């Protein structure tokens, strides 16, 4: 058999050849485009990973104008308590701890520029959660950005800003050392010393976002503190329960028709329980709360439950008093 190759074969139309060339060109374009895109994407990811993180110094500078000092007053009108807060609303909203604002006390806020403003309302509060938002008559404040608590991992670097022992806007860096349940509340455990005056300050990540509110220190382990997650503040932001300061000051006031007090100190009533804070001006630092109603006819029983929050305090029951230092009773705490 003779095979002849004279170059003859089936003819291809010119249009068909064009389609084939176009298909090859498209294939080459997509192939080279994919290869070119991969290095670009990798380069972008590398640049994002290598982007410089903020330093503690830069974060402290950025948030300085948003940190405030909160003071509440005692009976004589002088400052009795001091804590920290931070701006969450440009229209004068400040977040802090409930225990920082002092229940039924006049409250004032000092801004970074040194100006002092009386709180006009308790915008939102939750005594059980130990959280509060107050309002001052000041516009144009610089609110801090709030972070997502679930993104704050154990071991993460954090920055705390507050007023420990009155040392305003002090900055300390540390790490998240865990999450703990304390008295039924979820808390962020910190390898950071938290001192009196720090309460209510922000716990910041390395982007300057707030992830928690500094709340308490460990009484057992030094340089260990706890913060309330910022997610627990969100319900107060979403559904505030505003109370004008005039009404706030009357919360817990004793019924003058049933009780009278002597010797100073601060007596309050809540949910049928009477409590007292501070040292009285009477003998031995005593202060009395006396019933003004007539007792029932004898014989009758009287039951009283006494709880001391301070080991230095003492409590007693008074059966008769002359309105001054002279009174009769006994101290179930043995004066201790």
Over which residues does each language-model region extend?
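N-terminal targeting leaders that route proteins to membranes or the secretory/organellar pathways
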Residues: 1-5, 10-61, 79-80, 93, ...
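N-terminal activation segment of mature serine protease catalytic domains
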Residues: 36-84, 93-94, 98, 106, ...
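Conserved active-site neighborhood of the chymotrypsin/trypsin-like protease fold
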Residues: 44, 50, 74-81, 89-162, ...
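C-terminal subregion of chymotrypsin/trypsin-like serine protease catalytic domains
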Residues: 60, 206-250
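Catalytic nucleophile loop of clan PA
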Residues: 86-87, 194-214
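Extracellular carbohydrate-recognition regions
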Residues: 242-264
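Short carbohydrate-recognition loop motifs
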Residues: 267-284
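Secretory/extracellular carbohydrate-interaction modules
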Residues: 281-336
């Amino acid at each position: 058999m003779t095979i002849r190759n004279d170059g003859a074969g089936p003819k291809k139309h010119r249009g068909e050849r064009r389609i084939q060339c176009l298909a090859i060109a498209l294939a080459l374009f997509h192939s080279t485009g994919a290869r070119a895109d991969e290095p670009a994407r990798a380069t972008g990811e590398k640049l994002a990973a290598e982007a410089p993180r903020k330093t503690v110094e830069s974060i402290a500078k950025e948030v300085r104008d948003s940190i405030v000092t909160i003071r509440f007053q005692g009976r004589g009108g002088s400052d009795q308590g001091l804590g920290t807060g931070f701006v969450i609303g440009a229209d004068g909203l400040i977040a802090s701890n409930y225990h920082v604002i002092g229940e039924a006390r006049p409250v004032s806020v000092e801004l970074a520029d040194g100006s002092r403003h009386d709180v006009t309302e308790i915008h939102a509060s939750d005594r059980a959660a130990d959280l509060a938002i107050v309002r001052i008559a000041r516009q144009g404040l610089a609110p801090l950005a709030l972070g997502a608590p679930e993104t704050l991992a154990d071991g993460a670097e954090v920055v705390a800003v507050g007023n420990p022992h009155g040392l305003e806007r002090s900055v300390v860096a540390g790490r998240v050392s865990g999450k703990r349940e304390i008295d039924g509340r979820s808390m962020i455990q910190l390898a950071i010393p938290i001192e009196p005056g720090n309460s209510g300050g922000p716990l910041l990540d390395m982007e300057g976002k707030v992830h928690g509110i500094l709340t308490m220190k460990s009484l057992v382990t030094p340089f260990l503190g706890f913060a309330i997650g910022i997610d627990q503040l969100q319900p107060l932001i979403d559904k505030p329960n505003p109370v004008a300061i005039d009404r706030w000051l009357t919360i817990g006031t004793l019924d003058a028709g049933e009780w009278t007090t002597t010797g100073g100190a601060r007596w309050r009533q809540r949910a049928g329980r009477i409590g007292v804070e501070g040292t009285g001006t009477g003998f031995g630092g005593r202060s009395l709360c006396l019933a003004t109603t007539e007792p029932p006819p004898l014989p009758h029983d009287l039951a009283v439950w006494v709880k001391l929050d301070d080991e230095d305090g003492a409590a007693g029951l008074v059966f008769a008093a002359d309105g001054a230092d002279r009174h009769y009773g006994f101290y179930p705490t043995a004066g201790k």
